[in-house]
C-alpha cells in the first residue's frame, strides 16, 4: 500500500496469524513474526517468503525454504518437525528421512546471496522406507573412543525397500560422521 495515496501496489497472502510486521530500511524485505514462532523473510519482489526461521528449544534453530531445503544446528534430531507426504497424509516422517537430499548447511546465507538450489528429485520419487537399525554392542576402547556395532536390516515397503545407502551417525542430535566419504568425513 502506497502511503501517499493508499493504493495497493502488491498483494501477499500468508497462512497463519502475524504478531509483527517490519520492513527493512531498504524497503526490499518484509520480516513477519508469526503466532507459531516463525520469522518469515519475504523479499517484496517475490510472491512467497524466501525462508522461514525458527528458534528451537536448547538454542536450536531451523531454517526452511519454500521447496523443503533446510538447515539446522541439529539436522537429524528435531522431533517437532516432520514431513507429511501427499500420498500418505496420516504418516509423519522424521526430518532425517530426507537429510541426504534436503539438508543444506548455510542455507540462510546462501539464499540471501541469491543462490538457487536445484531439487535433487521430486519428493514422490524418493525411497521413504527406513531400514531397521539396532545397536548390537557398545565397547570402550583403550584410547577412550567407543566402538559401536550396529545391525541394519532391509525393510520391505509398499513400493520400495529400504537398504542402507548413506550412513550418518548422530550423538545428542549432532551429526558426527558420514559414510560414504564423498558426503563428508568417513566414519
Segments from the language model and where they lie:
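Short coil/turn segments that connect the beta-strands within blades of beta-propeller domains
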Residues: 26-28
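Short, polar loop/linker segments at the starts of domains and inter-domain junctions
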Residues: 73-76, 144-148
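Eukaryotic protein-protein interaction scaffolds centered on beta-propeller repeats
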Residues: 1, 6-13, 17, 32-137, ...
Amino acid at each position: 500500500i502506497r502511503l501517499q495515496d493508499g493504493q495497493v501496489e502488491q498483494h501477499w497472502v500468508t497462512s497463519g496469524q502475524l504478531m509483527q510486521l517490519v520492513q527493512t530500511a531498504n524497503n526490499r524485505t518484509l520480516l513477519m513474526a508469526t503466532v507459531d514462532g516463525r520469522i518469515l523473510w519475504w523479499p517484496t519482489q517475490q510472491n512467497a517468503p524466501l525462508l522461514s526461521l525458527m528458534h528451537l528449544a536448547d538454542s536450536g534453530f531451523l531454517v526452511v525454504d519454500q521447496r523443503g531445503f533446510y538447515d539446522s544446528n541439529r539436522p537429524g534430531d528435531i522431533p517437532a518437525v516432520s514431513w507429511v507426504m501427499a500420498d500418505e497424509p496420516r504418516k509423519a516422517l522424521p526430518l532425517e528421512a530426507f537429510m541426504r537430499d534436503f539438508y543444506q548447511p548455510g542455507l540462510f546465507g546462501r539464499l540471501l546471496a541469491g543462490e538457487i538450489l536445484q531439487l535433487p528429485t521430486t519428493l514422490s520419487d524418493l525411497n521413504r522406507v527406513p531400514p531397521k537399525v539396532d545397536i548390537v554392542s557398545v565397547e570402550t576402547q583403550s584410547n577412550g573412543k567407543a566402538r559401536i556395532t550396529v545391525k541394519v536390516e532391509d525393510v520391505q515397503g509398499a513400493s520400495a525397500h529400504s537398504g542402507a545407502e548413506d550412513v550418518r551417525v548422530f550423538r545428542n542430535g549432532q551429526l558426527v560422521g558420514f559414510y560414504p566419504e564423498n558426503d563428508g568425513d568417513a566414519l
